[in-house]
């Protein structure tokens, strides 16, 4: 690029009547070219994924340096049509212009929290559900809502469903999660029988409620 001189010499066909003409010149200006920067619109990503070469992958038709904004490694908040920008500086600055701002749009989808909830150990009838059973965790802060709720006493039975819904604190970047389940077995309880040794009796005294007075912690029938 720059100002250049063009020259020409002319030889006439009819040299008998015409002289040659030498060194006729003109000036020409060669302007710098503007590089063609190509940058395909990146596919949507999920919140938590840092920007990298998959998204920041502009190319040009001449060698040079790309500077991206936001930079590689940035974690964008969730949202549609967020602007990514790149500036391009050509290596051959004598013949190419810089390209200050090429942009594309990217969508960042909300992330779905990862809920971890191991199946609880079996419990015995009469044990209320509590933190030992209702102990799901998530990879982001939030609130768990259990069904049945803490304090519930389940009837005995195998493979009973416990369910939890999770509402993240950061609703801008995370989805809610519903219907995560585990199974719990509630074993039958063994009644507690209380029966104090009766006082001595005399031979011939018939056994009665005075001696046959066992009690249990649940309703039922005693057979002596």
Residue spans for each PLM region:
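Solvent-exposed beta-strand/loop surfaces, strongest in extracytoplasmic domains of secreted
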Residues: 1-224
